[in-house]
Amino acid sequence: MGVKVGVLALQGDVAEHIAAFREALAERPGSSVAPIRRAEDLADLDALAIPGGESTTISRLMGKNGLYEPVAEFEGGVFATCAGMVLSADRVDDPRVRPLSLIPMHVARNAFGRQVDSRETMLEVAGLAEPFRAVFIRAPVATEAGDGVEVLARIPEGIVAVRHGRHMAFAFHPELGGDLRLHRVFLEGLEV
């Protein structure tokens, strides 16, 4: 059976998410990936990716485009990266961001500081046999994970990957670099 994935397409690395999910779904007939710009675009989706970008901008645009409540109430799985991790939290250290409260966790924006402090590292992620090349770009970290949240990866700065039910959130960018293992883990989790 096909899987329908939407990518919130207001700002950020939308094209990279669409390409990664298309590749991850290539062997699933009837699957599709589409950009999401309006509330009605969420209908019939199995999953939604909330991309990296600027969390304050995405938060503002979600409100302006009438997407905040529909995304907060979305019943499918959510795959959130970088700014998406910030938005998916229930508590954020920046009052300019209106969190969606999809995952009970506290997130600190831009925990890595300036762009120059961004980095790549080989990261041990629970459930993966081999380390994952994680690209951190002005990344957030979760400073606290609530009840029912499975911490999948940590670095000295904090928690950088979590799962909560059918939702997954990452401080880094799994859509960059061609390693689709986390996309596949997420898609398999939709079937549970």
UniProtKB/Swiss-Prot annotation:
GO terms for biological process: glutamine catabolic process; pyridoxal phosphate biosynthetic process; pyridoxine metabolic process. CDD domains: GATase1_PB (cd01749). GO terms for cellular component: cytosol; glutaminase complex. Keywords: Glutamine amidotransferase, Hydrolase, Lyase, Pyridoxal phosphate. It comes from Methanoculleus marisnigri (strain ATCC 35101 / DSM 1498 / JR1). Pfam families: SNO. The gene is pdxT. GO terms for molecular function: glutaminase activity; pyridoxal 5'-phosphate synthase (glutamine hydrolysing) activity. L-glutamine binds at residues 53-55, 109, 137-138. It catalyses: aldehydo-D-ribose 5-phosphate + D-glyceraldehyde 3-phosphate + L-glutamine = pyridoxal 5'-phosphate + L-glutamate + phosphate + 3 H2O + H(+); L-glutamine + H2O = L-glutamate + NH4(+). The keyword Metal-binding does not apply. PANTHER family: PYRIDOXAL 5'-PHOSPHATE SYNTHASE SUBUNIT SNO, PYRIDOXAL 5'-PHOSPHATE SYNTHASE SUBUNIT SNO1-RELATED. The lineage of its organism: Archaea, Methanobacteriati, Methanobacteriota, Stenosarchaea group, Methanomicrobia. In the presence of PdxS, forms a dodecamer of heterodimers. Only shows activity in the heterodimer. Pathway: Cofactor biosynthesis; pyridoxal 5'-phosphate biosynthesis. The active site is at 82 (nucleophile), 173 (charge relay system), 175 (charge relay system). Its EC number is 4.3.3.6, 3.5.1.2. Catalyzes the hydrolysis of glutamine to glutamate and ammonia as part of the biosynthesis of pyridoxal 5'-phosphate. The resulting ammonia molecule is channeled to the active site of PdxS. This is Pyridoxal 5'-phosphate synthase subunit PdxT. Belongs to the glutaminase PdxT/SNO family. SUPFAM superfamilies: Class I glutamine amidotransferase-like.
